[in-house]
Amino acid sequence: MSRIFLKLISIVFLISCSDNEEVQNTEIITDSYFFQKKVFNMNLYNCTTPIENVDSTYKKTSDSLNFYKFSELTEQDNQIASCTQTYTQINELTPLKSGLLLGLSYMELSNCNSKVEEELLLEDLAPYLEYLKENDVQVWTGISNLENNSFLWINIWKSEEYREEFLLEWINSDNSGKFAIALSSSARCQNPSTYLFL
């Protein structure tokens, strides 16, 4: 009796696992790649005088007044005389563009204030991030955790020229107004500082 029951179970299992070319299901994962997103410790220094003997793991501007490092391991580095240090954890939002963190980095950094909780802020950013992904925009984006409703928004672009071309197209598109309205209800950002790191 148990032998017949096992055969019956096996037949049902085989039928359910067999190929059926007529039925194809596609599952859309709304936050795909979430499991691949990284958190980086960022040390950023803005100095009043050039600093020449900077650790080689840092990228610096040509005038040696600004330098930064993203690291998954290193925590806050030491203070440096005549420099303002910013240390924070940056949550990667565009993991498919992490290759832009290598080589030259054209960084855009904005200080922002959130009007909503962090979860709602990320929900409001989702259409913008999806647009970047669908249109293969060459920008890496990350934000810091909220602290007293403040956060840093960082974009690292392929190049300064690429950023300028993208922004020119973006400003003249319907998307910019649509996303600006959605984001303005969640956060307000200051004009960004930009740096070319070597």
Label for each model-derived stretch:
Residues N20-D174, S185-L198:
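Short S/T/G/P-rich N-terminal loop/turn motif that feeds into the first structured element of a domain
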Residues D174-A180:
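Outer-membrane beta-barrel domain signature
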